[in-house]
């Protein structure tokens, strides 16, 4: 069973922050062989979604930014390698979408999706809104989820 927590940067404990940075680095830097700095200075402005086991092991994570001006964004979506294949990514994204819709019901939601996950995000209701582009030498595409008014 996964325990979901929404925390501001200030609410993250040292242990939680360490687990978040460790998970993001293990996937975005090591696994994806992407030698770019993950800590981008934006975490203090974000809401942080942590999905953990009862033993406080972090299995998945995403961060959300408030609308600016009319579009919220979800990013740094990550699932631990050991936790993939059981629908956790869909649960994580649904938690993030629900959070955005509850807090900012009129806002659209943007993501910068890695191209190989395009179908995954489309099944969640995201639509392509940009041409493909490279971000840190990884193919991405802009996608958007429209607000339900």
Model-flagged regions — what are they?
Residues 110-112, 122, 127-142:
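Conserved catalytic-core motifs of GNAT/GCN5-like acyltransferases
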Residues 1-48, 52-57, 149:
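Short amphipathic alpha-helix that is part of the acyltransferase structural core
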Residues 66-75, 84, 105-107, 137-139:
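A conserved beta-turn-beta hairpin within the catalytic core of GNAT-like acetyltransferases
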Residues 50, 57-65, 70-78:
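Conserved beta-strand in the GNAT
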Residues 93, 100-113:
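Conserved GNAT acetyl-CoA-binding A-motif
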Residues 80, 114:
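Residue-level recognition of the GNAT/N-acetyltransferase active site
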Residues 79, 85-98:
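Conserved acetyl-CoA-binding loop-helix of GNAT-fold acetyltransferases
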